[in-house]
Amino acid sequence: MDAPPPTKPPRGVKYGKDESAGCGFLVNVIKSLGFSETTEERQKEKQKIEAEFKRSDLRLNELVSRHDQQLTQVLPLFSQVSSEVTASRERIHAVKENLGVCKRLLQCRRDELRKMWMDAVQHKYVLEMLEQIQELRKVPQRVVGYTAKRQYLHASKALTDALTTLNGPLQAVEGLSDLRTDLQTRRQQLYQRLHEELVTQVYTNSANEALSSFQRTNSSRLNSSFTRGIGARRSTDRIEANARVRKALAEMAQSFDLDKAEVIEDADLIYPELSMSYFVAIIVESFGMLHKVPDSLETLRVQIQTELLNVVRHTTHQLSVSGATADTNPLLSLLEVIFKQFKAIAKTHSLLLKNYLSVGQKYSVVGPQPYDLTDFWAQAQSVLQLLLTDYLDIQNAAADESAQTGFSEPTSNINSYFLRRKVPSTKRSMFKFDKSSHVGTSNNSDAFKEHRRNASDASVDDNLAGQLGGSGKGSTSGLFPHEKKQREKILICTPDQSIITKVYLPLMGYIKEIENFMKCKPGQPCSLHDFLDNYIKDTFLTKGHNRNLQLTIESLSKNQDAWRTIISPEEIKALNLSRPLLQSTVMVERRLMETKNLIQDLPCYSEDLLKMVCALLKAYREICQAAYRGIVQPDSEDKRIYSVAWLKDEDISRFLKTLPNWTDLKTYSQKSRHNRKLHRGSFEPSEEESPLQVQQRNIREAEMLTSNLGEGGITQQEILVEISVLKELAILQESMEWFSCRVSEFANDLRRPLVNGLNAVPAECGADIAVKDGTIKVMTNLALEFDELANTCLLVLHLEVRVQCFHYLRSKSSVRTNSYVGSKDDILEPDRQVQVLTKRLSEMDEAFSATLHPRKTRYIFEGLAHLASRILIQASNYLEHIDQITVQRMCRNAIALQQTLSNITASREVALDQARHFYELLCMEPDEILNALLERGTQFSEMQLLNALQLSCKSFGITDANLLASYQQKLSDILGAKPSKGVVV
């Protein structure tokens, strides 16, 4: 055996179900033999199979011979192991038989011992306490009977007398321990039953009474456990029943013999108030008999919060199922009902405390003093805070707080509910338990949602149950087993922080009543008031509304495309607008309207909200001004836009704002603001100017702009070439004007009393409700600044159109002099610069018509014909000589501009006829010019006519100075002026 143990040979190849192994091979052989048609084929198949078998036999012999030594070792070992296994089985069988014999012997001995012990105990009990036990054993049955009839005073007296006997003369008797324990257990059970009945009276019935007034029917009250049997009874029966109940209450208030007292049946308890008073008195009297007054007081005080939570949960469920709040705000209705229920419960607590005081004096109870209604309302505020925590979604916004590890009073349990909740993970869950038997059914409706609070709620409920279970002597941890479960909460609507805006004013009314109940001193608000104030300031405003305002400004300041993105056509229609606005402006206006609604909903925080609004508007003002500078200011600082530079000139700006067309436009804008709802989409024209006044105004403007134009002209870099830039400026103007109007309306609304649509502002907000005049003034000034920016944009557009006329129609003399002579352009077409100008004017009109109000487009293009006419006439100053082709080209220029401007303004621009008539004069001889002036009258200035005479003389080769002087003298005589000095402009 010194040789190493044999090793298991490697496992051979496992053949599959193919032709060379197992049954598959045999089947194939049978098939091949079956399909063979001749004996020769079968013989060949046989030989083939025999050859295969020979090869297999040879391989088997080879393997056996190769592993002969190992096989020789394995076979003896196998025989040895087999024999040892057989011997072990025989030994185990013998042990099993021996164990069976021992078991039977022990069973026989145990029965004998048990029988002897039971006989001895029974004999002892029978000899010592048979008669006493027989009497005491009747007590449990009597207690059960009294309890079934709800005669709690009789049951309490029977238990108290029996326990007094057991703890007195029979205290040393050990055989009565079971009976004593049973009676103590029954006393505890009766105490639990009485406590449940008291809770039902104080909380359930009081709450149902308040709930029934809200619901359509009083079925819940009719089905109440203590108000059964309110059937149709005669008035005399009702009077007699009420008299018996009042008599019983009067007897209980004094010392009375229970055996002689009249038993009041449930059928006699007709009126809920008498029923409640009677049962409360009965239960408190029973507590006094059972010596449970201190325990019951402590349990009631500790359990106020839990029972109020149950009332809230039950009421929420009832309102959700009945659909009573379908047409109103569900949370408002819920709060209204709950507060009425709390007041009814507080009234019942007041009655309960009076009975406790009477019973405590009657039985000389020594223990803790009864709680008062201040304690109740403190717990009620905690429950309301829990309710608001659920609906305001505070767990997702509250800051991290450390959980309290211990507390002395259950009233401090409320702090555990305000721990930060874990934010739900966005990852998909790996497992689902929706098919598990432990998963409850869920209602997917929006109005009825139920879920469990997290582990912090469970810990609170466990601590509360521990407090209840540890109260009183002999109390067990299972006093209120339902308290061990996690508290389920039912929501009547989806949690949302914005709900505070709908419930704030009603809540403030409830808080005022609570502070009156608790007799809070001025400047010392109740805890619910502090909770609501802290939530609104620290969470709803700081982390909600104010944060949204800051994010809006940050997004606008970082987004470069915010000044190019306009609102959609659907938004234009929704806002009752006719022109597009910047999306950023509408976004800020929405934030403004949100704040306006918040001021109406939260009037006590109007100053805080207005401070944030002013900061928002100031930041947006800076952004808008920066956007305006980005539009009109080129990249290079040494460049300038001519129209912007003109507008910065105070004289030009003041002159434009004093013109009648500007004042008329602003007057119309102000009227349209006041009458937007009545005259939307139309306008009543103000007092129209006469044609002469319009002509004089346009001439004044053209003269002023011409006089301020430099000698060098206007280059391509000094104009806004891109139409898209002008369109952006127009949209900015329209947006700023609209936004200014909205801000002004908002400021004007602040002057009126802030009243919510549901309730007037509560008195406690009176000190803060008046918005300061300084704040309103700041808002008004901001509105004026936005309006001023809109005016600036409009004036820039007004001047830019005129600057481009100067740019395209007035070039340097070196460029314009005789530029038409030898030109390759079609002589029947206007000048190329004029063609470019007319095209740009049409493009600008198209852009402005799509972005500006028609009155503003009219203001931009009105008077442009007078300026163009003046520029065309002044262009003659740069002509060295005149010919027919030049005159025709200049006339076509005037006609082209006239057609374009007439299409834009929808009126024939007669001012350009003057330019055409001027160049027609240049084709005449000097005498003809003077005769034409005598016949038609003059419509040009003296300088223009002098220039025309000089060009005419050059054209006809007149160079005699005396003749030129005579023509000038004749012109002066015609004009009635002094002789000219011969200066040509």
From Swiss-Prot:
Keywords: Coiled coil, Exocytosis, Phosphoprotein, Protein transport, Transport. The exocyst complex is composed of Sec3/Exoc1, Sec5/Exoc2, Sec6/Exoc3, Sec8/Exoc4, Sec10/Exoc5, Sec15/Exoc6, exo70/Exoc7 and Exo84/Exoc8. Disruption phenotype: Flies exhibit defects in development of glutamatergic neuromuscular junctions (NMJs): increase in synaptic microtubule density. Component of the exocyst complex involved in the docking of exocytic vesicles with fusion sites on the plasma membrane. Involved in regulation of synaptic microtubule formation, and also regulation of synaptic growth and glutamate receptor trafficking. Does not appear to be required for basal neurotransmission. One of its GO terms (biological process) is symbiont entry into host cell. It comes from Drosophila melanogaster (Fruit fly). The lineage of its organism: Eukaryota, Metazoa, Ecdysozoa, Arthropoda, Hexapoda. One of its GO terms (cellular component) is basal plasma membrane. This is Exocyst complex component 4. Belongs to the SEC8 family.
